[in-house]
């Protein structure tokens, strides 16, 4: 799909050349009980009051998300007009804009429209310019058009008819909007990869499949990749990671993918993604109901790989390293048992009180490995705890960090990207829950503050660099009728790196 930007000053009224541009449809926003303004006013004048008449007739009332097509329109270059309700102007917000854009795309995708002129990006969204509107609209469209049909014998209907979108923006925002469009496409491509990886079944998306995906990203975008196999992992003495992997016939992989967009000496940001391609719980077996969704336990890894793809396509001037420890967590005669004690790469011994708390066991060795890159910051991403879902539900990703500056950057990025996160505590007092009578620490700390103690466990292996942990257990996928991976937190991570790169 092709996206282009055109500066447009609606204050010029019907003299604006934008109105005569050929298009199958022009998208206009109308507020509830409000005098027409901007693009809607100009097109109303060009069509001799058509927009005003349909509003007066009650065909559309401007309520948020309502749509109405006007056909065989004369006086402008577009043959059709799509009116989109925006709700009350005094209540118009970023969310309302997103809802309006979504409604517009859904209406358009149900037609044979090929080329669209989209004017909503110039709407008065508080604290936002048209470049933000362009990015949000493209991401909304790509979300609407995403389909996962790879595993069906007869895939659903093909690509939508819509092929080209021209965004009108304020002339002063023209350059920024072009950058925003490019970044939005790259971001959507990264999110689609993340969603595809998450939606694939565990018998397809194995550790080897993730490794091959990383190799493809490296080949397509000129990145460096190293995939360490069993013997290399053993040589590194990653006993914690290997203790999880040994219960499965699928061989573990340790993926290191490097993007260099800045000077060689510039310290990289390291992203660590949990890659449990299927989590049965191990000997501490999960309940059978809903266990199919444990294919999503590699969404941390998927989001890190998706972010790397997006960053490479954007060409950001920043160095980034992705580390993905990946394996299955399965019950077997040689699998971890409750009470086993394993030795991590760092040398700390860990009492495995619950084999279903395996994510932290593979991440801790990856966090130790990350030290060799002398990172500017390390961010790990994991579907780590059900406790985080209890605390935050499915809206906010859980953010943990002792570094206030890094946490602030990530929260700012989450707000800018519309990919919300909420900071949770990481006080030293919680560490007491991880005490073991027989090892340096236990892998669980009991039911109270389960997401916090999981982060506390990881913090013991991330003491030598600025570090943050993102618990995406509640945000990486949806259940129910809309079951599927969300692509989060690729927008948050990408925006963080955009900000770091000064792009």
From Swiss-Prot:
Binds 2 manganese ions per subunit. InterPro entries: Leucine_aapep/pepB (IPR011356), Macro_dom-like (IPR043472), Peptidase_M17_C (IPR000819), Peptidase_M17_leu_NH2_pept (IPR023042), Peptidase_M17_N (IPR008283). This is Probable cytosol aminopeptidase. Mn(2+) 2 binds at residues 274, 279, 297, 358. It catalyses: Release of an N-terminal amino acid, Xaa-|-Yaa-, in which Xaa is preferably Leu, but may be other amino acids including Pro although not Arg or Lys, and Yaa may be Pro. Amino acid amides and methyl esters are also readily hydrolyzed, but rates on arylamides are exceedingly low; Release of an N-terminal amino acid, preferentially leucine, but not glutamic or aspartic acids. Its main location: cytoplasm. One of its GO terms (cellular component) is cytoplasm. Belongs to the peptidase M17 family. GO terms for molecular function: manganese ion binding; metalloaminopeptidase activity. It is found in: Cytoplasm. It comes from the Bacteria. Keywords: Aminopeptidase, Cytoplasm, Hydrolase, Manganese, Metal-binding, Protease. Its cofactor is Mn(2+). The keyword Nucleus does not apply. One of its GO terms (biological process) is proteolysis.
């Amino acid at each position: 799909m092709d996206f282009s930007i055109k500066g447009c000053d609606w204050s010029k009224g019907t003299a604006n050349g934008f109105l005569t541009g050929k298009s199958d449809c022009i998208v206009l926003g109308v507020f509830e009980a409000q005098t027409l303004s901007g693009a809607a006013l100009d097109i109303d004048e060009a069509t001799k009051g058509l927009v005003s008449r349909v509003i007066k007739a009650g065909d559309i009332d401007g309520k948020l998300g309502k749509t109405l097509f006007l056909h065989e329109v004369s006086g402008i270059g577009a043959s059709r007009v799509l009116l989109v309700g925006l709700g009350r102007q005094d209540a118009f917000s970023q969310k309302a804009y997103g809802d309006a854009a979504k409604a517009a795309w859904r209406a358009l995708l149900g037609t044979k429209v090929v080329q669209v002129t989209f004017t909503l990006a110039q709407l008065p969204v508080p604290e936002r310019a048209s470049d933000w509107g362009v990015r949000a609209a493209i991401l909304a469209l790509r979300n609407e058009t995403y389909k996962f049909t790879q595993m069906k014998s007869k895939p659903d209907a093909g690509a939508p008819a819509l092929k080209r979108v021209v965004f009108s923006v304020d002339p002063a925002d023209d350059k920024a909007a072009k950058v925003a469009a490019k970044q939005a496409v790259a971001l959507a491509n990264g999110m689609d990869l993340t969603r595809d990886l998450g939606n694939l079944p565990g018998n397809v998306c194995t550790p080897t499949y993730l490794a091959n995906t990383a190799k493809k990203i490296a080949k397509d975008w000129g990145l460096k990749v190293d995939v360490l196999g069993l013997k290399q992992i053993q040589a590194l003495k990653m006993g914690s990671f290997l203790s999880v992997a040994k219960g499965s016939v699928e061989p573990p992989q340790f993926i290191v993918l490097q993007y260099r967009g800045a000077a060689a000496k510039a310290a990289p940001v390291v992203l660590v993604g949990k890659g449990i391609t299927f989590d049965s719980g191990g000997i501490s077996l999960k309940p059978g109901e809903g266990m199919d969704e444990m294919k999503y336990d590699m969404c941390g890894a998927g989001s890190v790989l998706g972010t790397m793809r997006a960053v490479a396509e954007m060409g950001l001037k920043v160095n980034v390293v992705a580390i993905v420890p990946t394996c299955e967590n399965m019950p077997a005669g040689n699998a971890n048992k409750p009470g086993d004690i394993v030795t991590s790469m760092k040398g700390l011994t860990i009492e495995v009180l619950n084999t279903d708390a395996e994510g932290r066991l593979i991440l801790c060795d990856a966090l130790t490995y990350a030290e060799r890159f002398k990172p500017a910051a390390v961010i790990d991403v994991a579907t780590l705890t059900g406790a985080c879902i209890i605390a935050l539900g499915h809206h906010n990703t859980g953010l943990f960090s002792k570094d206030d500056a890094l946490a602030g950057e990530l929260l700012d990025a989450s707000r800018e990207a519309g990919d919300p996160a909420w900071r949770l505590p990481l006080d030293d007092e919680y560490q007491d829950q991880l005490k073991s009578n027989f090892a340096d620490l236990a892998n669980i700390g009991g039911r109270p503050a389960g997401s916090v103690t999981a982060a506390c466990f990881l913090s013991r292996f991330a003491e030598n660099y600025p570090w943050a942990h993102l618990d995406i257990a509640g945000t990486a996928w949806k259940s129910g009728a809309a079951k599927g991976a969300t692509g989060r937190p690729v927008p948050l991570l990408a925006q963080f790196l955009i900000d770091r790169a000064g792009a």
